Amino acid sequence: MRDIKTYLSVAPVLATLWFGSLAGLLIEINRLFPDALVFPFFSF
């Protein structure tokens, strides 16, 4: 039972950190390359 409580307290924190960092990354990409359908750093 203690393991379940530990999981339920850790999983939301990790999910919040992961989705927050992912959102920040997407925001920065859209700030550097606005309205880009094909990103310049993918085409070599």
Swiss-Prot record:
The chain crosses the membrane at residues 7-27. Keywords: Chloroplast, Membrane, Photosynthesis, Photosystem I, Plastid, Thylakoid, Transmembrane, Transmembrane helix. It is found in: Plastid, Chloroplast thylakoid membrane. It is a single-pass membrane protein. The keyword Methyltransferase does not apply. One of its GO terms (biological process) is photosynthesis. Pfam families: PSI_PsaJ. Its main location: plastid. GO terms for cellular component: chloroplast thylakoid membrane; photosystem I. InterPro entries: PSI_PsaJ, PSI_PsaJ_sf. Belongs to the PsaJ family. May help in the organization of the PsaE and PsaF subunits. HAMAP family: PSI_PsaJ. This is Photosystem I reaction center subunit IX. It comes from Piper cenocladum (Ant piper). The gene is psaJ.
